[in-house]
Amino acid sequence: MANVTVVGAQWGDEGKGKIVDWLSNRADVVVRFQGGHNAGHTLVVDGKVYKLALLPSGVVQGKLSVIGNGVVVDPWHLLTEIDKIAEQGVAITPELLVLADNACLILPLHKDLDQAREAASTQKIGTTGRGIGPAYEDKVGRRAIRVADLADPEALKPKIERLLAHHGALRRGLGLPEADGAALFDQLMEVAPRVLAYAQPAWRLLDKAYKDGRKILFEGAQGALLDVDHGTYPFVTSSNTVAGQASAGSGMGPSATGYVLGIVKAYTTRVGEGPFAAELDDEVGKHLSTVGREVGVNTGRARRCGWFDAVLVRQSVAINGIHGVALTKLDVLDGLKTLKICVGYRIGDKVVDYLPAGMRDQRAAEPIYEEMEGWSESTAGARSFKDLNANAVKYVRRVEELIGAPVALLSTSPERDDTILMRDPFQG
């Protein structure tokens, strides 16, 4: 049996939540390894809707769930999410949820900074304003407050002072009032007992699980095109979202992260600012937005929609080392007479088959499309490949050819069971 790493292969919102939930039935442990509570996902289980942003999807299945050291954790949001899920009948105990004791915390001052910067900037990034970026800055700057620090109040006080010395200068430059260190200390001490109940060295637990032969599912957030190194910089998130981060963000060696499953929509969406060559602002774009219900779980922002971009996904396949993909929302294409797939870009007098790193070229890129015949038959709820009409099958096969990876799973509705298994990722 192989472990499985799940990553988004586009700009996020590909349907990772449903696929991870579906795979959780086959896993023993589910691990979040990067990001924060800026990437929400919706799970539909037995008609009940669960909306998660920080908790691993495995909690809904009652599977051991781990928030790894690569995640930045807002302790107040964590407890709120735990309480909300508990109200839906899922008790989140320390036996079910483990929080890496070396994970860094998101504090109120991080949110202040995030929102003030976005408001003051002439170049909007489209941040969620939840403090994720500033929290990662403090982590890299070696001044972050970590989960383990909550267990040592006396040592925490000077760490807060050092942190505020840095943030004070930033806040003054943005016209924000000074942060209150004593108030922050009291806030942290108030939540410390509940947070610390879940904390332990996650890497040790995962190492033992791996050696015991337990199946581990690594759950990525957002998508490869939002990766701080490989995405459409600077319109990216503040962490590495690619499969390689599964190792660093969990404390497990690269050989343990196993089969890489990329999650891919049958079309393309993006939230916030940044280049998007295949974007549509016509009736087809409205169809994708309306039928696909393309609104952000966390922010409520409408997602920008466009045709499937094989150039971007092929690049994601290479960067992530993707073995196979889960193709989601195929049913959203039902009823479209003609489908288009972006197979290259025209930039000035050049034709390229990859996304250039420079923002000028990214913005100038014009899509080169290949057209395919659509279908009128419904694919919604299909649970077998033979249930798909001929044109839908042709579309899936052409996507495989263009991205250089096979389709391992096919999703035909938000319901967990409306999933066609073509190859079990846990079989490697």
UniProtKB/Swiss-Prot annotation:
Per UniProt, subcellular location reads as: Cytoplasm
Q: Which UniProt keywords apply?
A: Cytoplasm, GTP-binding, Ligase, Magnesium, Metal-binding, Nucleotide-binding, Purine biosynthesis
Q: Which cofactors are reported in the record for this sequence?
A: Mg(2+)
State the protein's name. Answer: Adenylosuccinate synthetase
The cellular component terms of Gene Ontology attached to this UniProt record, alphabetical and capped at eight, are:
cytoplasm
> Its principal location?
cytoplasm
The pathway entry for this protein reads as:
Purine metabolism; AMP biosynthesis via de novo pathway; AMP from IMP: step 1/2
Question: What reactions does this protein catalyze?
Answer: IMP + L-aspartate + GTP = N(6)-(1,2-dicarboxyethyl)-AMP + GDP + phosphate + 2 H(+)
Instruction: Name a biological process GO annotation.
Output: 'de novo' AMP biosynthetic process
Q: Which Pfam families match?
A: Adenylsucc_synt (PF00709)
The record's InterPro entries line, in alphabetical order, gives: Adenylosuccin_syn_GTP-bd, Adenylosuccin_syn_Lys_AS, Adenylosuccinate_synth_dom1, Adenylosuccinate_synth_dom2, Adenylosuccinate_synth_dom3, Adenylosuccinate_synthetase, P-loop_NTPase
Q: Give me the residues that bind Mg(2+), please.
A: D13, G40
How this chain assembles, per its entry, is: Homodimer.
EC numbers on record: 6.3.4.4
Q: Where does GTP bind?
A: 12-18, 40-42, 303, 329-331, 411-413
Family under the similarity heading = Belongs to the adenylosuccinate synthetase family.
Q: Which GO terms describe its molecular function?
A: adenylosuccinate synthase activity; GTP binding; magnesium ion binding
Q: Which organism is it from?
A: Caulobacter sp. (strain K31)
Q: What does this protein do?
A: Plays an important role in the de novo pathway of purine nucleotide biosynthesis. Catalyzes the first committed step in the biosynthesis of AMP from IMP.
Which residues catalyse the reaction? D13, H41
What does the entry list as the binding residues for IMP?
D13, E14, G15, K16, N38, A39, G40, H41, T128, R142, Q222, T237, R301
Q: Which positions in this protein are listed as binding substrate?
A: V297, N298, T299, G300, R301, A302, R303
